[in-house]
Structures are given as C-alpha cells and as structure tokens.
Amino acid sequence: AGACVLLYRLVLAVGSAHRARWATALFAFAPTGFLLQVAYAESLLLVLLFGALLALVRRRYWLIAPLGVVAAFTKPGVLALALALAVHLVVRWAGARRSVRAAEVFPWRDRIAIVVTGLVVAAAGLAWPVIATAVTGRPDAYLDTELSWWVGFVGRQHFAPLTPWFIMASTWLGPLGIGLVVVVLAGAVWFFSRRSTRALGTDVLAFTASYGLYLVAVFLPQQSLPRLLLPMAPLLGSDVFVGTRRRAVTWLVVGVCLQPIAIVLLWFLGYP
C-alpha cells in the first residue's frame, strides 16, 4: 500500500492525476502484483525507492540519504539512485550556467547536498562486497555468491559487466538469442527516447534508465526478471501505457489476466 501511495504521488508530481491514477492501478494489478502481498523484500525496497525519487523530484536531497542507505541494505540496485543524482546534478548545473542568476537558480547548499547524498548512497550500494570480504577474508566472496545462482542456468562463468544477458541468450538460443537481446535493447532505447517517456521528467528518466542499465550490466535474466523490473514502475505513467483511457484499460485487463499465470509459473511451479 505504501509503494502504491508513493508511486501515485511521484507520477502526480511529474505528470497529471490521470497518469498517476492509471500508473498506480497498472502497478498494483500487474502480473507480479501478487509479490506485494508476500514476504519478499520488494515491498520495502519499492517504498524506499519511490520515496527517494519523490524527494529528488521535490529537491529534498537530505531525505534521500537515509532512504537510499536503508534501500541498499534491503536489496541490490541502489547504485542506480546514485547515478540518477549525478545526472540531476549535471542537469541543474548546466541550467544554472545559462542563467545570469546562477547562485539563485542552483545555490551551493543544493550542490553540496546532492554531492554528499550521492556519495553516501553510492557507498551504501557498494557496501555488501566490502562486508562479505571483511567477514570471509575472501575478496571474491560476494561475487562468487552471486555467480553461484547462475550455475543452474549457464554453468560456471566468469563475470564481466554487460555480458550476462548475452551469456544467457547464447547458452539457450545460440546466435538467435544474441539477436533477440539486441532487439530488446534497441526497443528500450526507442522507449526511453519517446517524447511521452521524456515527459516524465529528467529525474524519473535518469533513475529508470540507470536501473535498467544496472540490470543489463550485472543481472542474469531468468524467472526473477519480472520481479526485478518493479522499480521501473514510474514508467507506467508514459503515454505508451496510459495515453488514452482505452489504452490504459487494455493494459489493466492484460495485467489482471496474466496474474493467475504468473502466480502458477512463479510461485507454484517455480520461484519469483
């Protein structure tokens, strides 16, 4: 419930009441919506991330730090928030340079708050590998633990950023899989470049694009992918999903119809 409220407030802050209502409905009734009712970390993570994004949009930078730190120790992926802060800093700085009142448009207190908050969130996002190394005495402890989840899908692999999706695709589908990944990535670029998506604002766009980049860089796509896509829910405010009432209703019906299938596949037959 908290994630839905904050998502509504976030989309309302960058869009309209129509977009906010429908984006929240699509999020709640998505195929993976049932995960919000079970004891998974997603519910807490989404509350923290949506709260941090809302604080970013409202320029309450110091509030982002505690939310980001707690989120970092809830689930991986908070580095996307740090990158979004960096993009926000650059955009505000560039805007201030074009103004004759730069000190008023972008005061130093805001610059300091953004930099400090970004560094704190980034440090928290990188903390688990350091903790794992300190506890086990092995510098590769965290990475080996993560790679152990890959064995059942692609066997033993060496990690290199931006390769997991291609490894998974080539293992199961060969060259066709590589082409499929390229098509998916091209589709993502097309979606983010649409005017209706960019209308959600730099902050939402920066975070969701950064989070998508994080998934492509380090995550092996398997049945957990739908669950890990939940933090990108602010994009549901795009015209692609809620541009018209008919379009929004269609997506809502699709989500509701797919929920039973997702529950069977990801809960009874597998794990989300």
Say what each PLM segment does.
Residues 1-14, 186-193:
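Transmembrane-helix motifs of polytopic, lipid-linked glycan transferases
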Residues 6-9, 26-29, 44-63, 82, ...:
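Specific aromatic-rich, kink-prone transmembrane helix
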Residues 7-29, 200-202, 206:
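Transmembrane-helix signature of polytopic, membrane-embedded enzymes
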Residues 38-44, 225:
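Short acidic/glycine- and proline-prone juxtamembrane loop motifs at membrane-interface regions
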Residues 82-190, 204, 208:
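Membrane-lumen/periplasm interface segments of specific transmembrane helices
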Residues 118-122, 244-272:
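Signature aromatic-anchored transmembrane alpha helix within multi-pass, membrane-resident enzymes
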Residues 196-218, 228, 251-253:
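Transmembrane alpha-helix segments characteristic
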Residues 223-241:
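Hydrophobic/aromatic-rich transmembrane helices and adjacent perimembrane loops
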